[in-house]
Amino acid sequence: MASSKKPKIAVVGATGNVGREVLDIIDEKEIQYSDLIALASSRSKGSTIDYGENKSVVVADLAEYDFSDTDIAIFSPGAKVSSEFAPKAAKQGCIVIDNTSHFRTDPDVPLVVAEVNPEALKDFRKKNIISNPNCSTMGMLVAVKPLHDHFKVKRIVVSTYQSVSGAGKEAADELFNQTKSIYANEAVVKEKFTKQIAFNVLPHIDVFLEDGQTKEEWKMYNETKKILDQNIELTATCVRVPVFISHSLAVNIEFEKPYDEDQIREIFKKSPGLKMIDYRADEGYVTPIESAGLDPVYVSRIRRDPTIPNGLNFWCVSDNLRKGAALNTVQIAEILIKDYLSS
């Protein structure tokens, strides 16, 4: 590992949506580094990525790269690539922060949301890998964690409204192209999604499991338990909607302890990573388009659920490419630099 006080940072999958966002956020946050390396497949070798205000970096080939003098590598290349290259980088002494689903269920890999469980980072040396949670889980838990600290969450029922960018650039292109085709009275082409996504909603994200859940719903259940509390029960319905950026969630919580709404609002106001906009009037809530490009998880529509004891409903929205992926990995890197690499 490099000995410089300023870390050497690599961004793997730098040409993708999340990788580019990582580069932008590193620049926005003015993170001090000795070198910043952009890595991708051999197809992109030698190409230039523009990021930040007026910076650029030349892409190197991931397969040819030696991680032994790199301090931190942020991986966003897809699970298959991470499964091959992240362990290699970790064995060479580089700390890997992985954005894919591959390591999330590994008991020896911390699954971390910066505002929720940063203390879990203490165990990263077991494999030198840290995992970033699913984007919907992350947005929800930033809002749920401070409530759990005060009232102890017993059960969560959540319905998600997830943008197409969560399925990658090809999915966003498909929504755009299908929308154009419909207006032009042309045939709709389906490639990325099994059904038309334009002007439609699909209750199907990732593969179906034997019990009828989709894997996305299973992820939310398992990741919530690993990150927050094994005793919390959760059921999810995950839906893809024809929105380009930002995921929205309708969250219903049953607490073990009683609460009043003023307490909830005060907690939300004081919690890191959250912004409450809830006026109980027209335009008094946040929508996906308003959260796009911004860091916070926004909470709105806060109200009691009168059908169960200690029940609460709220709406939360966050940019899935920023807080749901890129921002959290950079926040983790900041914690590592400050608390684990500074000595």
What residues fall within each predicted segment?
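N-terminal Rossmann-like NAD(P) cofactor-binding subdomain of oxidoreductases
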Residues: A2-I197, E233, K257, E266, ...
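A glycine-rich, Thr/Ser-enriched phosphate-binding loop motif common to dinucleotide/cofactor-binding enzymes
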Residues: N128-G139, G212-Y221, K226, G324-N328
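Oxyanion-binding "anion nests"
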Residues: A198-F244
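Glycine-rich phosphate/pyrophosphate-binding beta-alpha loops
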Residues: V239-P242, S318-K323
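Conserved glycine-rich beta-strand-loop-beta hairpin in the small C-terminal domain of fold type I
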Residues: I245-A250
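Short hydrophobic/aromatic beta-strand micro-patches
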Residues: N252-E254
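A common structural junction motif
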Residues: Q263, F268-D278
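A glycine-rich dinucleotide-binding beta-alpha-beta segment and adjacent secondary-structure elements
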Residues: K275-R301
